[in-house]
Amino acid sequence: MLFINKSYFDIHNFNTKKGYTMIYTVTTTTPLAQVKEELVAHSKESGFGVLGSYEFQKILQTKGFPIDKDITVYEVCNPSAAQEILQSMSAISVYLPCRLSVYEENGKTVLATINMKTVADSLDIDEELKSHIYSVYEYLENIMNSWN
């Protein structure tokens, strides 16, 4: 059984040892249900399509491992960006499609994703590919900040 020390994450805010934020989060007062309802439209406005979603509360309930939190992860993709990145570096596929997590914490809605700038900075890649990854990540940030 896996045990996670929640206070570790509260204190460290998902930072790496070098101080880079690995998980980018945005908090909004917009209700969770509204964010989930509008996420597809906001993604399309930024050139991303939603490929699928995973409602962990429902999935884990059916497996006999219920959780109290409503956590949904959306897989989003910009096909032309994915093509360019994958043609440059196949291994980056482990981070694709991009994922946006939506859940409620302390009465507010939280949107979270992997900080692709941190990922790009940690890879030995050329500046053109790094710049392209940064650009895609900025679109994800814009989607996540749509409710603020």
Report each predicted region and the residues it spans.
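Terminal, regulation- and interaction-focused segments at domain boundaries
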Residues: 18-46
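Short, Lys/Arg-enriched N-terminal segments with co-localized hydrophobic residues
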Residues: 2-21
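Well-ordered alpha/beta subsegment
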Residues: 122-148
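Compact, glycine-rich, soluble single-domain proteins
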Residues: 55-98
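Charged, well-structured alpha/beta interaction segments
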Residues: 41-59
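Beta-strand/loop substructures that line and gate deep hydrophobic ligand-binding cavities in soluble
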Residues: 99-126
